Structure formats: C-alpha cells, structure tokens
C-alpha cells in the first residue's frame, strides 16, 4: 500500500468515517513530504472528504487541489452545545452522500475529538446509548475518554 498512515488514524465507522491528527503532522512545522505521503495513503483508503476542526483553514487549499471535498468547523477549547449541534449536523450531512468517506481531524487527537465522535454516534441515532458510544470510542482509540470528552456526549 502506497503512502504513509497518518498518526492516530482510526475508522470510527468502517469505510465511512475516520479520524486522525492533522495530515502532515501536528504543530507549527508540518512536513510537506509527510503531508503528501499521508494524502496518498488516505486516498488509497477511499477517503474523499476532509472535515477540519482546526482553528485555521490550514491545508484546506492543499486538500481541495488534490480532489478532496473539504469542511471547516473551527473548534474552540470550550465547546458550547450550540456549536456541537452544528458540527454534528454538518458531519451527518456530509455522510448523507453514500459515496462520501470522511476523515475528521484536528491538530492532535485531543480530549474534544473523541467526545465529538461519540456524540455524533448518538446525535445521528446510529447508537441510542451514550455509555455504549463512549465504550466503543474507547475501544477503537485504545484509551479512556477524558471527563471533558465524556461531557460532549449527549445524555451522559
């Protein structure tokens, strides 16, 4: 398989919704060659859309130039419920296209991202049990969700 798998890449919904840290690496000095290798790998997985939770529009133009559909929803450190619902709805709408395979990323796979993903599973009614959503994310990511992440899951 060509390319380089991004750090913290995991399928949340196999073949449909994935997560990773920022393509090309996190921090102030992402590497162009690494970004290109990771894009090649992501494309080999069939992913055709990037959903960025970064504060800036960093890399969005690069993603568009190589054919990705892009979404950008900057995420503050303290996420208000109104913002969560907007993000959940945007993910749901993006995934309503049966051909769309979406990668969600932020600089790092921090506390908020797992909570948003578990919350999306509840919001979209793919699951109806917040405890199960939390457990599934913990199993996929191989780490416990923080209290901050758990607080982002509806009905917990």
Task: For the regions a language model picked out, list residue spans one by one.
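Glycine-rich nucleophile elbow surrounding the catalytic serine of serine-hydrolase chemistry
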Residues: 110-116
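Cys-dependent protein tyrosine phosphatase-like superfamily
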Residues: 1-103, 116-156
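Conserved S/T- and glycine-rich ATP-binding loop of Class I adenylate-forming
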Residues: 106
């Amino acid at each position: 398989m060509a390319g380089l798998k991004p750090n913290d890449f995991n399928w949340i919904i196999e073949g449909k919704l994935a997560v990773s840290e920022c393509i090309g690496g996190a921090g102030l000095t992402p590497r162009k060659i690494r970004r290109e290798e990771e894009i090649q790998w992501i494309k080999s997985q069939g992913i055709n859309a990037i959903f960025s939770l970064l504060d800036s529009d960093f890399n969005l133009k690069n993603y568009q130039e190589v054919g990705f559909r892009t979404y950008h929803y900057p995420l503050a450190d303290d996420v208000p419920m109104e913002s969560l619902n907007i993000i959940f709805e945007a993910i749901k709408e993006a995934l309503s296209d049966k051909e769309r395979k979406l990668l969600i990323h932020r600089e790092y796979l921090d506390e908020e991202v797992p909570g948003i993903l578990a919350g999306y599973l509840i919001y979209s009614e793919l699951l109806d049990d917040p405890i199960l959503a939390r457990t599934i994310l913990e199993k996929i990511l191989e780490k416990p969700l923080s209290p901050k992440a758990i607080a982002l899951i509806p009905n917990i």
